[in-house]
From Swiss-Prot:
It comes from Brucella melitensis biotype 1 (strain ATCC 23456 / CCUG 17765 / NCTC 10094 / 16M). Keywords: Ribonucleoprotein, Ribosomal protein, RNA-binding, rRNA-binding. Belongs to the universal ribosomal protein uS8 family. InterPro entries: Ribosomal_uS8, Ribosomal_uS8_CS, Ribosomal_uS8_sf. Signal peptide: none annotated. One of its GO terms (cellular component) is ribonucleoprotein complex. GO terms for molecular function: rRNA binding; structural constituent of ribosome. NCBIfam families: PRK00136.1 (NF001109). GO terms for biological process: translation. Part of the 30S ribosomal subunit. Contacts proteins S5 and S12. This is Small ribosomal subunit protein uS8. SUPFAM superfamilies: Ribosomal protein S8. The keyword Membrane does not apply.
Amino acid sequence: MSVSDPLGDMLTRIRNAVGRKKTKVSTPASKLRARVLDVLQAEGYIRGYTQSEFENGKAEIEIELKYYEGVPVIREITRVSKPGRRVYVSVKSIPQVVNGLGISILSTPKGVMADHEAREQNVGGELLCRIF
């Protein structure tokens, strides 16, 4: 069965794993998913991830979730731009998440990055998701 929104599928897997207090979650691999996970790791929302490839050519990413004193670091993770309704923002209209406590992840011409990086580089793009 194919997934119509691979990034949304990964975010849902993370949300469900955090709700069940799992330490790891796996998802099929893609370049976009890996770039989003790079941002999440750099911002301190996940411990890390490993990518492995199987004999049949399929690749999988195993994400190691992060907890602080038993409480999940990720409280909320939501998809903003969806396949049926893309959301694009200019650098001036990049929203702050919970007054700057959370982050937005954007796909820009300069790559996938967090909202504060996009403001520094003065670039807008597709608003992929919000994390708090």
